[in-house]
Amino acid sequence: MGKVVILGVFVADTAYRGSRMPKMGETILGNSFVLGPGGKGSNQAVAAGKLGADVTIITRLADDDFGKMAMETWENANVKGAIKYSTNSYTGAAFIFIDDKTGDNAIIIAPGAASEISLNDIHDNS
């Protein structure tokens, strides 16, 4: 397999399953919760790495628990990280609600440090 370079985002997915979304100001019980690695670019890098490609992901993280999750995820998939660390932000996260009955989802993403990705990040790694 060849070389793959991905400019993308890592977010920690927080996925909640429930019978419905709560209304504003309401608290309801959910049926399950999963915390794991996500982000479209990161997911593509991991898939390509697991298939044997020589993969590098260009992104930004923070030095926090979710940033550590990203690095561990990529290490386990043989993905090299071309990472710049943000000192004034956080590693991104996503809230994912999954409807138990239909499987439909609703997602809110807070990209954090990844929102600081710039053209210089590409130039610095080319």
Predicted regions: what they are:
Residues 1-58, 68:
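Glycine-rich phosphate/adenosyl-contacting loop at the front of the ribokinase-like
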Residues 26-27, 35, 50-126:
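Conserved N-terminal subdomain of the carbohydrate kinase-like
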